[in-house]
Amino acid sequence: MKIAIASDHRGYPTKQELIKYLSKKNYEVLDYGTNSTDMVDYPEYAFKLGESVANKKVDFGIVVCGTGIGISIACNKVKGVRCAKVDNIKEAELTRKDNDANVLALNGSMPLYRVKDIVDVFFNTNFTNVDRYINRINQIKEYENNNVTKKFEEKEVRNDA
């Protein structure tokens, strides 16, 4: 399995530990930066990783920043990416089973043992292919492709009292 990984400066130490961990588990790991704890802006790294996932150059991605929130927001701007900010193994399992997430976002302050458990569950859980989940993912894809139906358009709000 080929894994892309990226972080900002606050996620860098966790990213480096994850690269070692994943390599020992025989995953092929592509590092999209950053390469130090010097302050950087996470969107650049999130977009690079997201493009590699969307273009199927890798099977999955992992992004890490101080909270996991900002980098996940940036990653989700890439068409075809379904990035989930995960804090525990239950969320890791469900985001794969129900949402077919292809990028995992992590908090760089989380203990490494917990990060490893989350990563293992994420990579070892398959999408369920249940119709209702497929339908929801297809709605997201449709929206991304600008095939938005009227029900998603903004409606005028009237305050007639």
Spans of model-derived segments:
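Short amphipathic alpha-helical segments
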Residues: 16-19, 73-77, 117
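Glycine-rich phosphate/diphosphate-binding loop of Rossmann-like nucleotide-binding domains
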Residues: 4-24
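A short beta-strand-loop structural module common to alpha/beta enzyme folds
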Residues: 28-39
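Helix-adjacent hinge/juxtasegments
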Residues: 45, 49-85
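C-terminal binding/interaction regions
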Residues: 6, 10-13, 89-161
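Structural motif
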Residues: 6, 32, 64-65, 86, ...
